[in-house]
Amino acid sequence: MEVLMAERADLVYHNKAIDGTAMKRLISRLIDHFGMAYTSHILDQVKTLGFRQATATSISLGIDDLLTIPSKGWLVQDAEQQSFILEKHHSYGNVHAVEKLRQSIEIWYATSEYLRQEMNPNFRMTDPSNPVHIMSFSGARGNASQVHQLVGMRGLMSDPQGQMIDLPIQSNLREGLSLTEYIISCYGARKGVVDTAVRTSDAGYLTRRLVEVVQHIVVRRTDCGTIRGISVQPRNGMTERMFFQTLIGRVLADDVYIGLRCIAARNQDIGIGLVNRFITFRAQPVYIRTPFTCRSTSWICQLCYGRSPTHGDLVELGEAVGIIAGQSIGEPGTQLTLRTFHTGGVFTGGTAEHVRAPSNGKIKFNEELVHPTRTRHGHPAFLCSIDLYVTVEGRDIIHNVNIPPKSLILVQNDQYVESEQVIAEIRAGTSTFNFKERVQKHIYSESAGEMHWSTDVYHAPEYTYGNVHLLPKTSHLWILSGGPYRSSIVSSSLHKDQDQTNAHSFSVERRYISDLSMTNGRVRHKLFSSDLSGKRGDRILDYSRPDQIISKGHWNFIYPSILHENSDFLAKRRKNRFIIPFQYDQEGEKELIPHSGISIEIPINGMLRRNSILAYFDDTRYRRSSSGITKYGTVEIDSIVKKEDFIEYRGTKEFSSKYQMKVDRFFFIPEEVHILPGSSSIMVRNNSLIGVDTRITLNIRSRVGGLVRVERKKKNIELKIVSGDIHFPGETDKISRHSGILIPPGTEKKNSKESKTKLKNWIYVQRITPTKKKYFVLVRPVATYEIADGINLATLFPQDLLQERDNVQLRVVNYILYGNGKPIRGISHTSIQLVRTCLVLNWDQEQNGSIEGVRASFVEVRANDLIRDFIRIELCKSAILYTGKRKDIAGSGLIHDNVSDRTNINPVYLKDKIPSFIQHQGTVGTLLNRNKECQSLILLSSSNCFRIGPFNGSKYHNVPKESIKEDPIIPIRDSLGLLGTTVPKIANFFYLSYHVITHNHILLTKYLLRDHLKQAFQVLRYCLMDENRRIYNPDPCSNIIFNAFDLNWRFLHHDYSEETSTILSLGQFVCENVCLFKHGPQIKSGQVIIVHVDSFVIRAAKPYLATPGATVHGHYGEILYGGDTLITFIYEKSRSGDITQGLPKVEQVLEVRSIDSISTNLEKRVEGWNEHITKILGIPWGFLIGAELTIAQSRISLVNKIQKVYRSQGVQIHNKHIEIIVRQITSKVLVSEDGMSNVFSPGELIGLLRAERTGRALEEAICYRAILLGITRASLNTQSFISEASFQETARVLAKAALRGRVDWLKGLKENVVLGAMIPVGTGFKALVHRSRKPNNIHLEIKKNNLFEGQVGDDILFYHRELFGSCGPNNFHDTSEQSFMKFHDS
């Protein structure tokens, strides 16, 4: 009592309110100072005091006590204003959807956080004794987050997938929620409930596995005598708190010196005082003992464990520390689950630190060190790659601000900034423990229309023929409006593409086509057109070969784009290009025109790049009907493709798989192949010989005889029949040594009878080994093909095609369609084309460096009786016209009076009356659609366009005159003028001219569109000029013509003055809100389609911004419908750092599997360490040291990983617990096959210490390597089969144990519990064992007592015998803990 009085005199008197955290601190100090029992008395008094006070106060809680925060109104209003501005920018096309989502979430998150911080001061000022305030902030009930939901705002919620819903709940629970908010909050609540349930079960299972691994670990003895330890020193990254946590309660493994003075001795445990001393004296690294270094195999000693966390004293002997460790790690899992629900998965770590200006002034920095970029909200900013010094010049003072690298500078050089204005944003450090995950976000089209983009787009390599494009730089995607009309029945229409029509002129009969079949991805169109006599010829022909046009009657000219009377027409659609096959029927002249005909191949949008194939021709000589393999022998293959041509450009062909032949011969090895479903029964055996017409399955018979090879694939069976001679090799046979080679004729072939014969033909030798010992050689016949360059090209392609014009060359190239050694599979009854002769388009890159591609289109021109067909190929600067002249034998005067009875390639089918046509005039345009069976046509009605103008009294000055050069005059058919009046015929001539348009960079007000400010974009436009020099644009780029509709144009009259006006060019895209004229901003965004002297017409369009790396779906000029996917963004976001990551992450580390690419794969690292050290040190030492080092390394990194997860959640777990578990999963080694010792079999898992001891005892190297077991595997590899069987796989474990005759020594807890025996733990256990043993051993001398006891105890419990000299009476801990008290540091 006197002691207490004396101490009480020293105590400091505190007078302040105490909350939850202070209470925790107080209790821990009390336990340290007075011990457990005394503290519990004190706490009892605190409890009674608390209840007495609460009774007197009688706190109650009513709804009026929930005071809302006064500043909430304008905060919410401000956030709404910001998100409204954001919405506007999105509709102008300045930010894209992902940036918008990100920014709106951050706006609301910041608002909600600000309100949460306001909450406490608000209560303190207005009503400090408010019950809600007292309860939550004292830590009695409720936390800040819950109170915030009651009186602040509920904020952002997440949907069941864990994604944020970007509509925040603005009300709090006191005000009540609107209907929408109620539904959203139900989402969040449901996620919380589901999460809690799932995580609780997960945490429970984790605990079960952990306990299973370490259940047998008990403190068995005082000291194992190890001299090793791990070093701890306060590194720069380690906070003082972490240093404290690591050291307190451990035992020193070595003396600690400062200079020559020893301040702490070995085997002394560390208290707070000692740690403070280490910190103040800056001691050298402190070596501590950990469970890792304990030398006991299957238990642990007192000193390696250290203090027990429960009572702050050295752990007692017999305590089951393993189970405590397992539960300490598993249990927080359940708490963590509940924690997720409160944060609701809000974007954490999304807000970055800001640098603010220190005072008003001008800001200056070196502009060469920064480069422009976009922030993640889409704002323009500068990125600095190194440290940047920024000076702010005020009136009387100059401030220097240092900005770290990788930061974003949000102001411009020489800009005036105000004090506290944000001038830079520092990237949030990546050290925070949150994963980045890559998320895809799809953007859908809001309206129907036609797609355009204003930059180059590359194909993603894996979708070479698909319609997935990658954007290389920031640009806009435009959806040009137009009402699409989809027709599912293909029919003919009398109107050509780009005709202007009147709604009532459509008199199309309904004609249904019976057979619209799809074969091999090709669509057959059967077209009918009018007979001379007016009858309908409705014949349906069967096509024998898909590449052929069957032409009857007397039409002899090639007409690729127009079909005439009675001719049936078949277009092959290959992914995204159409191929028009055609052939001549020459009756008069006998020309060498092969039967198969030439196919001209032009992509849908008509753009061809360099090395594109313009036309090809399949020679029948290289056609095979059977499957087989092509070989080029020793021929060198030269790929004609340079690297730059690998990028396929908007659907033209690419040649990565096509090879050009250097040598003019290749070989084809025939074989018969049947691909059968996996379930079918085969009637022949593998490697058996069959004759011709043998039955293979129930309904298939072989066409050739030979050897049968059966190969089973995943879903089907591949059965080959290989014809050829079987040849059993003799000793001296040369052929048999090789396999898979071609042998030329003239080689001597030895038979087994030693008679020599010379080969007549090429043969192919293949070695077949049915069993391991036997093998034979199959000699297979080979078909040899010579590729003749001698095909007279003039007969294939018209001669004037092959002359060079304007740097465009056309080369004839033969391609082999299949790679060397590739097996070719023919589908039943189709022929395989081996070689294709192609016409390849090329031009000089040097002279025309800017030319991206050429445009190909078909043109038809009629003059008197001569019909000319052109394939027009234009570079951006010139037109090359190819005519195929064919005389029209039957005078064509009758037919061609009305031009419109020719049908187009992609015909239009219209219903009897389409509502949109009846209302007003429209324009028909056809486009090939993605959908193969449907044609699309787009109707532009006046509602899609609006007109701006007229401008009075201005000269037309925005067409660069010099770019218009007149080409040779080309007769073009009569056509309606643009405004519906017929243009005066000046001998029927138009001037056809080209006008290269550079896209003015899209005019934007605020946002910087990086990447394409300076690059001009060249689009080929045709401007037709009549004699008044007006310019019209029939824009063949899109297959749509925009004509004058009836006059519901919007006339927006503006005084058009040259100074303020922007020069408009045809086809230019104009964004919304851009000032074109003095009178105010543009009302809608769109594309300029018609420019008049006094006005212009804009076709409405919606811009979508896309950043580099985004994927664009669909093709340039394709018709899209509302709701189609336009763009897919891939962006990184930090996952919310709640336990949704925590628990699985811990589990993943403990089970040693890498679910996630982010977590470094520990197993690989472990194997790497193993190999290197073994290589350096040689065999016996290498294994010993290698395994040791590996295990030490991996243990430390595992502990750090697990701690990281828990710390990020704010859960404190002592390292000891984790170490015990990690020790168990890393303590095994795998015996390798290198040294076959007679003790362990290779592949056996044994303890590391046992391996080392056995190695010492045998004096022979055992080769082993360290291995990481997961906790499940570790539980199934213990010394007790009873505990394994009670964990998992009971039958398997028991059966194995019975077969091996395993003995269970019942050393752990679980085995004893299962058998109902007494468990070998508990602090009284040691005394019990010794009492039962003492009577037998009385005659021994008493002074040896200690040594004897320790040894007997070991012997009974464990079959490992180990003598330690340190167990004698001279041990530091020879008596009980009292002698130790002098080192106890209170």
Swiss-Prot record:
Catalytic activity: RNA(n) + a ribonucleoside 5'-triphosphate = RNA(n+1) + diphosphate
Coiled coil: none
Cofactor remark: Binds 1 Zn(2+) ion per subunit.
One Gene Ontology term from the biological process aspect of the record: DNA-templated transcription
Keywords: Chloroplast, DNA-directed RNA polymerase, Metal-binding, Nucleotidyltransferase, Plastid, Transcription, Transferase, Zinc
GO CC terms of this entry: chloroplast; DNA-directed RNA polymerase complex; mitochondrion
Principal location: plastid
UniProt GO MF annotations: DNA binding; DNA-directed RNA polymerase activity; zinc ion binding
Pfam families assigned to the protein according to its UniProt record, in alphabetical order: RNA_pol_Rpb1_4, RNA_pol_Rpb1_5
EC number assigned by the record: 2.7.7.6
Positions of Zn(2+) binding: 224, 294, 301, 304
Subcellular location: Plastid, Chloroplast
Gene3D superfamilies per the UniProt record, alphabetical: 1.10.132.30, 1.10.150.390, 1.10.1790.20, RNA polymerase Rpb1, domain 3
Cofactor section: Zn(2+)
Family: Belongs to the RNA polymerase beta' chain family. RpoC2 subfamily.
NCBIfam families in the cross-refs: rpoC2_cyan
PANTHER family assigned: DNA-DIRECTED RNA POLYMERASE SUBUNIT BETA (PTHR34995:SF1)
Subunit-level organization: In plastids the minimal PEP RNA polymerase catalytic core is composed of four subunits: alpha, beta, beta', and beta''. When a (nuclear-encoded) sigma factor is associated with the core the holoenzyme is formed, which can initiate transcription.
Protein name: DNA-directed RNA polymerase subunit beta''
Species for this entry: Acorus calamus (Sweet flag)
Gene from which this protein is expressed: rpoC2
